[in-house]
């Protein structure tokens, strides 16, 4: 039976699965990240993507102002990458944020000036999903030295339709 991936709210019992996803992506996360994700998931809005009943990804978003939010974490299990799961999860998160009145979303990732190749796909993911690179901060407070942060933003809005379809990116501003 083919099960469609589903997104639901992160629950306390999902922390071990999130940790396993993080540990399975050693090129992307440092050893202190599982504790940070667990803390952030308990303190902010968080979701998991399940595939055939198994947690295959997670996302955490923090509301920064009445109209702004930041995607703090998003990750998909290494064995399930490239199947559209990240886009599905991000779309769900952005739709939820837009329905809550958020109009600008920020994401941070490792900047291309770092020369670290694994993050090329990460930056491409944000750009493919309507995010625009607006700045590089080095050093970013809280990040290890030598890890320039690429700051990405996207303008979002809820369509107002019953389906809640989201408009992302600069094209809807015209």
Where do the language-model regions lie?
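A short, internal acetyl-CoA/4′-phosphopantetheine-binding micro-motif in the GNAT/acyltransferase core
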Residues: 74-82, 110-113
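Class I S-adenosyl-L-methionine
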Residues: 139, 146-148
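Acetyl-CoA-dependent GNAT
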Residues: 5, 9-73, 77-79, 90-92, ...
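A generic structural signal for beta-strand entry/edge sites
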Residues: 66-68, 104, 149
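Conserved active-site alpha-helix within GNAT-family acetyltransferase domains
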Residues: 87, 111-135, 144-145
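Conserved GNAT acetyl-CoA-binding A-motif
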Residues: 97-118
């Amino acid at each position: 039976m083919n099960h469609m991936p589903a997104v639901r709210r992160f629950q306390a019992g999902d922390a071990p699965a999130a940790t396993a996803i993080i540990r399975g992506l050693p090129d992307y996360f440092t050893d202190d990240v599982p504790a940070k994700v667990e803390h952030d998931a308990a303190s902010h809005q968080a979701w998991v993507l399940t595939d055939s009943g198994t947690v295959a990804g997670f996302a955490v978003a923090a509301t920064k102002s009445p109209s702004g939010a930041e995607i703090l974490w998003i990750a998909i299990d290494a064995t399930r990458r490239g199947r559209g799961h990240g886009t599905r999860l991000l779309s769900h998160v952005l739709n939820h944020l837009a329905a809550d009145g958020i109009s600008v979303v920020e994401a941070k990732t490792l900047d291309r000036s770092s020369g670290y190749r694994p993050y090329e796909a990460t930056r491409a993911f944000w750009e493919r999903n309507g995010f625009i690179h607006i700045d590089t901060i080095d050093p970013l407070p809280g990040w290890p030295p030598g890890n320039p942060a690429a700051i990405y933003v996207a303008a979002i809005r809820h369509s107002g339709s019953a389906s809640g379809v989201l408009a992302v990116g600069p094209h809807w501003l015209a």
